[in-house]
Amino acid sequence: MKIKYLALVTVLCFVGCTNSHQKHRNSAQSVEQNKEVSYAKGFRINRFKYCTQLIVMNPWDSTNVLESYVLVDRNKKLPAHLPDGIVVRTPVERVAFSSSVHAGMWNRLNKAGLTVGVCEPEYFSNPVITQGLSDGRITDLGMATSINIEKLIAAAPEILVVSPFENTKRTEFEKVKLVVVKDASYMEESPLGRAEWIKFEAAFTNEDKLADHIFAKIEKNYNELCRKVATTTLRPTVFTEKKFGDIWYVAGGKSYLGRFLRDAGASYMWKDLNQSGSMPFTFEKVYAKAVMADYWLIKYNDKRGNMTYEGLKNEYQLYANFNAFRHKQVFAINTAKTPYYEAGPMEPDKVLADLVAVFHPELVPGYKPTYYFNLQKGN
């Protein structure tokens, strides 16, 4: 699935709402409690006596704040003095999403039923949302990069959750005066850091305790797997993806995927590529480095069926020369049949378990994969 991120937007209030969506610029209250965020680098939660402040750090300049939100109980009078930020009355009762990733978090919080609009509905598999789209309760807002403003106004969400994008603005939202919530979870480099953003989303629905419980379980499972991996010194080599046209995009060693591979006890062929983004390489350059690698991981999208070794070879004959192909050690995710992009960010423990089962099956005997399957077996 291709996830398209909505660009940075001008955040204003929703048409017809009260002054509760004004942006406050004073800090008369003192912080009563700083809620601990253990892994995520992109947000902070400050607890005050009468409100909660969410601070989203700028992913491209961590010394600066991208946006702040001040959450105030909708059933109480708005306090006279509030910390800096856009005021949102909670719990939020109507929400729209530009990405299925954020909707996946709300689903884990049992709040998918609050959805009134989504972008690119073909990427949503949650039955609550697909049924809502079918019966007209949820509006198809069009592409994430060009939202249908008229439909957005008609859907009347209190907030629109988006992924911020660097160096761009969306001025059409000035007309809508909608509270746009910028969730930058996709910029986190660690799997647990990305999953911890459920605490950020939960604050809008007053489900903080549930989010803490969910994340604690994920954290426990993930770290237990890491401890198992630490008991073995074997580090099989691995490379990822395949070429797109003439270009093969290779994830950096500091990337989200790179961290998964390290934690799963594999030696990523580009672990020394000191960046979190991807680099474009030619097939020849990838082949020269990865031809003898032990394993090959691929993500693809095919509604017709699962990829086979023969099918992979037919895509490009030279794929068959890789050692991992010859030894039938190619594992893949068919994103058309598994909700990897929708649910995977909130299931890093399951993704890690899949990878441990690939590289060190003796550590998880009898394990049944969730996302990654050998091409011989499919899912």
Q: Where on the chain are the PLM-derived regions?
A:
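Bacterial Sec-dependent N-terminal signal peptides
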Residues: M1-R25, L355
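Bacterial Sec-exported substrate-binding components of ABC uptake systems
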Residues: C17-A103, L210-V238, P339, V358, ...
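A short, structured surface patch at a secondary-structure boundary
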Residues: W60-I153, L160-F165
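Short, structured coil segments at secondary-structure junctions
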Residues: K111, V176-V179, A264, R326
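Extracytoplasmic substrate-binding proteins
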Residues: R137, N148, A156-I247, K271-D272, ...
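A ligand-binding cleft/hinge motif common to bilobed small-molecule-binding domains
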Residues: F165-K175, Y300-K313
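Flexible, glycine-rich surface segments
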Residues: N221, L225-E310
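Extended, charge-rich intrinsically disordered regulatory tails
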Residues: N314-A320, A324
